């Protein structure tokens, strides 16, 4: 897949830069954790594209080629801008893939527009980032390195408090976040992500789903 420049203008005027790989009408958009950049998601790009999805990844403000300074308070603003841009580009399925503190922010029901599904790598709760699962039934898939007790407890708690489907895939390692896309876990993680997104696409196209939205 050939990468194209992808830009998002946030509500406070900050320009976020990234890359997109256009494909089918359904989109998977990806946001890294603090201290990273969009390169962490490259292992997913080819497999998702081969499955017929359009893919986009951004650098958060203050990271990579994006403008601004990194700040926890800016995470919801950046995520909302990314989702709004994706919704302008498609009326199809919209899936968010995120890691760490950004993954936790994606759980807020106040984040609009809402995605159809969430793939969350080691969500990390942090002061100033709201996570309120009781108001949101978005289907979710969590990844976590279970050898880190705090990370494992966080994911189990989030899964238990979730409304709607919430699956957890854990690995016997302290590795967390998008680093789980490295060996030896890479192929299994990729398979699970693509399978989950395929399932979300099938559910979004079902007559029950279509009838329930009218």
Task: Please name every model-derived segment.
Residues 25-33:
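Short beta-strand element of the alpha/beta-hydrolase
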Residues 179-195:
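Post-His helix in hydrolase/transferase enzymes
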């Amino acid at each position: 897949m050939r990468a194209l420049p992808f830009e998002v203008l946030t509500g406070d005027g900050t320009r976020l830069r990234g890359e997109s790989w256009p494909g089918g009408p359904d989109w998977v958009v990806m946001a890294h954790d603090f201290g990273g950049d969009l390169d962490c998601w490259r292992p997913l790009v080819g497999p998702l594209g081969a499955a017929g999805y359009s893919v986009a990844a951004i650098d958060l403000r203050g990271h990579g080629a994006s403008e601004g300074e990194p700040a926890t308070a800016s995470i919801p603003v950046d995520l909302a801008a990314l989702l709004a841009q994706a919704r302008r580009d498609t009326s199809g399925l919209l899936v968010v893939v995120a890691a760490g503190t950004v993954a936790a922010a994606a759980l807020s029901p106040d984040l609009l527009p809402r995605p159809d599904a969430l793939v969350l790598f080691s969500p990390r709760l942090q002061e100033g980032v709201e996570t309120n699962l009781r108001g949101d039934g978005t289907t979710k898939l969590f990844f976590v390195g279970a050898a880190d007790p705090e990370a494992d407890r966080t994911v189990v708690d989030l899964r238990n408090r979730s409304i709607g489907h919430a699956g957890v895939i854990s690995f016997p390692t302290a590795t967390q976040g998008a680093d789980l896309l490295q060996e030896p876990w890479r192929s299994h993680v990729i398979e699970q992500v693509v399978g989950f997104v395929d399932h979300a696409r099938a559910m979004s196209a079902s007559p029950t789903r279509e009838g329930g939205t009218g």
